[in-house]
């Protein structure tokens, strides 16, 4: 991640929303550059670390929280759960998300795991921790990203616009207190990982429920359909 002003790295609405933690963002940039200097790589690529914040802040209607990036080289792209279009096979959690997507909405399975269309349509795909060492899950937890991503979530919750937060798993559920506001409805279920998907993720209908809630709050529904 390059040493540039935050306003050059993220969308302007997000630059304002993250102003309270601008020093922390700079500190995380220094941390990542120190990792590289020490011969340690990180994922995703530097230009994708803040990718979730490059889509308009004012357009966000849905928040989907992940834990940290995929630790498999070539998988992490800066959006929670998403992978590059050429990744095969899909990560098992994402495959389970797609199975529920098909069961919930009746759409065919997407041709690839790229969730960019969702991000472009107002879905913030945000990991709580934005980087990871390759093949070392959770290796960057507690380094400082949580302060930044929680600031982002607080900024969303402080708006007046309707929003739905989809929290999958216990880790994401700890954010619920930040989202307990009049303009936000929280949908909770177990995580789509193979260890927990059969305990309540399958059948939870997060996509159709989200749209029902948004319409009920006077907002437009999300077009969830993927190629």
From Swiss-Prot:
It is found in: Cytoplasm. The active site is at residue 68. This is Uracil-DNA glycosylase. It is an enzyme of class 3 (hydrolase). The gene is ung. Excises uracil residues from the DNA which can arise as a result of misincorporation of dUMP residues by DNA polymerase or due to deamination of cytosine. Its EC number is 3.2.2.27. It comes from Mycobacterium leprae (strain TN). It catalyses: Hydrolyzes single-stranded DNA or mismatched double-stranded DNA and polynucleotides, releasing free uracil. One of its GO terms (biological process) is base-excision repair, AP site formation via deaminated base removal. InterPro entries: UDG_fam1, Ura-DNA_Glyclase_AS, Uracil-DNA_glycosylase-like, Uracil-DNA_glycosylase-like_sf.
